[in-house]
A protein has these predicted regions:
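Terminus-proximal functional modules
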Residues: 1-75
Length: 75
């Protein structure tokens, strides 16, 4: 399980709160077993689509809490 601080940072970034500023064309996430990215276009459109960096599988979430409950946080 990820720290409460990292989960809050992830939630705040996805909900447009806090001081998060994307520095690239993608936002990077991690889980216990995978790494994924969200395109900047999806982030700006509030679409929670993560693409697994090793398999190419796309994970879609409806809320930040759903994404967090699946074990994903900012990398």
């Amino acid at each position: 399980m990820w720290s409460n601080e990292l989960q809050k940072k992830t939630r705040d970034a996805l909900e447009g709160k806090g001081e998060f500023v994307p520095l690239a064309d993608a936002i990077y996430f991690k889980s216990d077993s995978s790494f994924a990215e969200m395109s900047l276009a999806d982030y700006l459109a509030n679409k929670l689509h993560l693409t697994d960096r090793s398999t190419g599988e796309i994970y879609t979430f409806h809320t930040a809490d759903e994404l967090l409950n699946a074990g994903w946080v900012l990398d």
